[in-house]
Regions:
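Beta-hairpin "wing" of winged helix-turn-helix
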Residues: 67-78, 82-84
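Short, hydrophobic-biased segments on the C-terminal half of alpha helices
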Residues: 63-64
Length: 117
């Protein structure tokens, strides 16, 4: 019997997939607020859920999306789950944004030059 071994995905495909997950995770206002709060300090899931008008299970699902995107690390101590931000996961998104930031900066500078004349 022939065994099928898929070839590993090229590194660029993996980077693109991770970038897609990061932007998808950050597309939701609740998840952006969770990231904002975790940027300040490590929190329990219960602490993270407190300000939201949703169930603990719903907040936990949002956290799972952030985990899948590599933005959040969850650790367990007894029955308590602690979450912390993994800021290095934002590097790819920041690099992507920087490309377009430079692009638009150049465009606006060119426009400013045209308007001066």
């Amino acid at each position: 019997m022939v065994e099928y071994k898929p070839s590993p995905a090229p590194v660029t495909d993996l980077r693109e997939a991770l970038l897609d997950r990061v932007f998808a995770a950050l597309s939701d206002a609740t998840r952006r607020e969770l990231v904002h709060r975790l940027a300040e300090r490590e929190c329990t899931v219960t602490e993270l859920a407190a300000p939201f008008a949703m169930s603990l299970a719903a907040v936990s699902k949002h956290i799972a999306v952030l985990e899948k995107a590599g933005l959040v690390r969850r650790r367990k101590d007894g029955r308590t789950h602690y979450c912390s931000l993994k800021p290095e996961a934002l590097t790819g998104a920041l690099d992507w944004i920087a490309i377009y930031q430079q692009f638009w900066r150049q465009r606006f500078d060119a426009l400013a030059d045209v308007l001066k004349d």
